[in-house]
Amino acid sequence: IGLVGGVGNTANWVGLADVKLMYYGSDVSELSEDDSRFDVRDGTYGTVTVRQNLLSGLWNMVCLPFDLSSAQVRKYFKEVKALESVELAGEDCNLNFGNMRDMVAGVPYLVKVAQTVSVQTYEKVTIDADAVSSGATVVSDGAVTARLQGTFQKVVPYGDNVYAYEPNVFSKAETGTEIKAFRGYLELEGVFPKRLNLY
């Protein structure tokens, strides 16, 4: 890369230092919680739109394929929490969530929105398709292990101890329960609790 210089353009070249080329793919990418396949290429995009219904006044689950800075988080979310620990207390299983400022690709979060949102739009974000595997949150107290797994496409999780999330509550998933894209579900190992509490 160079700049042509000199009067009359005499083919003198000046090199540029500290240059970075960025791939923006198609300038706009649109994602939806109803997507059955996640086939977006990794890379930085000028604009990414996420079609997802988030209800005001409730804790919604969100798992995005790109990082968000604290400034980007505040655009739509007034509160964000991530799973930090799990505790077995008799017949109860307590899931403890802590406040977060940033959001990491592939990690499922509980979020609150100031008003109901159906479309989110973000600029200059970098999509990482593999983050859905590496971003799963796993916590344990020795007696019970909880794995909060995000989704980038619709999935039907299998297992005896799988919980689907509806705003404010996890409930035992029936066989064949479909989890929407950009959400998440919970798997427990070592215990079948009567009650699952969120704190």
Which sequence ranges carry the predicted segments?
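Predominantly extracellular/luminal cell-surface or secreted proteins
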Residues: 4, 22-24
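A short, polar beta-strand/turn micro-motif
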Residues: 26-76, 96-168, 173-199
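Contiguous mid-protein beta-loop-alpha structural module that forms a pocket-lining wall or clamp
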Residues: 82, 87, 109
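Short linear interaction motifs
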Residues: 89-96
